[in-house]
């Protein structure tokens, strides 16, 4: 991920410079507002786990939320601070392992993350920490996909091949251009979630941690660009939305 930081940052910079920042911002803000009606953004503590070059942290800080952003990789955090510009002082950036969050219990009202869970070595441990740091009544928003399932599943492999064929005759950019695909596949082979049926796996685990969770398997239709839809047609993004029980409920 250290080597990917500059390239990944470029992708985030494009998102920040286009309508994607509005699409993603509205998608997240609507769910936060539904969970905390009447509360102003400045009173809501948000943790962005695996912030990477800072896309979520930046758009949420711009909306006025109290934002803390963590990433395991120092170079990603450097890119995030650079991308944040004048907003950098409004975001609490910290280098931290997503599987071992060093925050006190109940520190945040909202936890957001995107394309992180799939590459964790112990995602169940991560979920235990994520739910621990959420305050009672807190909201979890996890945007992810079953990335690299084609390494283990024949049907997914056929879908991946179709994606590459359709991409070759399209007018959109290949998202893998400049990416060390072998290195990314090596990561996927060492982590457990590319082999799992998701988001069903996530919902089962979160239930064990007392989180009422549901999955929106069509969220990709709202948040993905044409380019993303063609590149990743066989691996659609889903949203896991979880709610931690309130004090009276627990």
Question: Which role does the model predict for each range below?
Answer:
Residues 1-42, 55-59, 139-177:
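Conserved class I S-adenosyl-L-methionine
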Residues 99-110:
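A short acidic, Gly/Pro-enriched loop at the edge of an enzyme's catalytic core
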């Amino acid at each position: 991920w250290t080597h990917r930081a500059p390239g990944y940052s470029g992708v985030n910079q494009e998102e920040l410079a286009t309508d994607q920042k509005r699409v993603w911002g509205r998608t997240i803000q609507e769910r936060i507002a539904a969970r905390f009606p009447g509360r102003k953004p400045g009173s809501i503590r948000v943790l962005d786990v695996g912030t990477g070059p800072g896309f979520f942290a930046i758009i949420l800080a711009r909306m006025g939320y109290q934002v803390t952003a963590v990433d395991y990789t120092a170079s990603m955090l450097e890119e995030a601070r650079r991308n944040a510009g004048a907003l950098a002082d409004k975001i609490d950036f910290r280098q931290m392992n997503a599987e071992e969050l060093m925050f006190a219990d109940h520190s945040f009202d909202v936890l957001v993350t995107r394309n992180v869970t799939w590459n964790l070595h112990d995602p169940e441990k991560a979920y235990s920490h994520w739910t621990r740091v959420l305050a009672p009544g807190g909201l979890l928003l996890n945007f992810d996909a079953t990335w690299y399932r084609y390494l283990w599943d024949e049907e997914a492999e056929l879908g991946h091949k179709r994606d590459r064929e359709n991409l070759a005759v399209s007018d959109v950019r290949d998202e893998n251009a400049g990416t060390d695909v072998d290195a990314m596949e090596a990561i996927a082979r060492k982590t457990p979630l590319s082999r799992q049926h998701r988001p069903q796996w996530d919902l089962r685990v979160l239930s064990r941690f007392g989180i009422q969770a549901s999955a929106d398997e069509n969220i990709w239709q709202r948040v993905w660009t044409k380019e993303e839809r063609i590149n990743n047609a066989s691996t659609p993004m889903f949203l896991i939305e979880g709610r931690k029980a309130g004090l009276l409920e627990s």
